[in-house]
Amino acid sequence: IKFVSEFLQKQQIKKQFGTYLSPAMVEKLQKNPELLQLGGESRELSIMFTDVRGFTTISEHYGKDVQGLTKIMNRYMTAMTAKIIENNGTLDKYIGDAQMAFWNAPLDDAEHAKNAVRTGLAMLKDLEKFNEEIDKEGVPAFGMGLGINTDVVVVGNMGSSQRFDYTCLGDGVNLASRL
């Protein structure tokens, strides 16, 4: 029974965190489930928001070709999300053409501020490559707005009993979104 319980717990951790953490971080959580704290906690995080600049021009380029617009946005989000995961970030959510990510939760990351900045720089570098690729396809260049803030915020599972997300909130999050 203990084996089944542990297996189910590991599967739950993979289901909950597998889509927005690197496989190595998910494995750490599976081996050490006590690192997860249900509810919320105050913690210093580095929070990043990015958004596409020039989205109106890009969407006008596609006109009524919603599949084309969806495909190019998915390519962009995939490339940028990879940088978050590679640098030990937690992808919080997509908000239209924006992304929200944070560092130092659910696992401790003593280098969270540096990792967030490294991610931003890597994203900007990859954006250049991405724009070179899509230029060959006749697609207008993507611009990127990027804000990073480090502050003590509340992080944890938040929402309703029917649906919740692992996210963060507080003044520090709001500031990052406005940078």
Model regions: which residues?
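Regulatory cytosolic signal-relay segments
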Residues: 1-43, 57-60, 64-67, 71
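Catalytic NTP-binding/metal-coordinating core of nucleotidyl cyclase/transferase enzymes
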Residues: 36-118, 166
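Feature representing long, continuous alpha-helical segments
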Residues: 11, 15, 19, 23-24, ...
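Short secondary-structure boundary micro-motifs
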Residues: 2-3, 30-32, 76-77, 130, ...
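Two-component transmitter module helix at the DHp-CA junction of histidine kinases
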Residues: 26, 30-35, 60-63, 81, ...
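Catalytic core of nucleotidyl cyclases, primarily class III adenylyl/guanylyl cyclases
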Residues: 83-115, 129-173
